[in-house]
């Protein structure tokens, strides 16, 4: 298994680990999203001083406004964070 295939598998497993806790097992509720962010992206969450960060992320991700985040909506968050991390990495390499 390549590194990229392994990363994709990890994304899928992480999503379903959290999405299967309550309600629709293929979507993240607000509580499941918060749990995922705290468990998997705690450094990112801690860096934000905004107490409404989870609500804002949920609102931004929930494109169809159903109050839940499906896998496709979740991957948008991961992609955006990855782009931001890459930009930071490139800047740090320049210095």
Curated annotation (Swiss-Prot):
Assembly, per entry: Dimer of either two alpha chains, or two beta chains, or one alpha and one beta chain. Also forms heterodimers with S100P. Interacts with AGER. Interacts with CAPZA1. Interacts with FKBP4. Interacts with RYR1 and RYR2. Interacts with CACYBP in a calcium-dependent manner. Interacts with PPP5C (via TPR repeats); the interaction is calcium-dependent and modulates PPP5C activity. Interacts with ATP2A2 and PLN in a Ca(2+)-dependent manner. Interacts with mitochondrial F1-ATPase subunits ATP5F1A and ATP5F1B; these interactions increase F1-ATPase activity.
Keyword Transmembrane helix in annotation: no
Signal sequence residues: none
Binding site for Ca(2+) 1: 27, 32
Protein name: Protein S100-A1
Top-rank lineage group of the source organism: Eukaryota
PTM comment: Glutathionylated; glutathionylation increases affinity to calcium about 10-fold.
Species for this entry: Misgurnus fossilis
Classification via InterPro entries: EF-hand-dom_pair, EF_Hand_1_Ca_BS, EF_hand_dom, S100/CaBP7/8-like_CS, S100_Ca-bd_sub
Gene3D superfamilies, per database record: EF-hand (1.10.238.10)
């Amino acid at each position: 298994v390549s590194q990229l295939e392994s990363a994709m598998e990890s994304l899928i497993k992480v999503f379903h680990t959290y999405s299967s806790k309550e309600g629709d097992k293929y979507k993240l509720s607000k509580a499941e999203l918060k749990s995922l962010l705290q468990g998997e992206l705690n450094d990112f969450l801690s860096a934000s001083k905004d107490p409404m960060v989870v609500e804002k992320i949920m609102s931004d991700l929930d494109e169809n406004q159903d109050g839940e985040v499906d896998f496709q909506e979740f991957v948008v968050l991961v992609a955006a964070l990855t782009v931001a991390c890459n930009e930071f990495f490139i800047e740090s390499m320049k210095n």
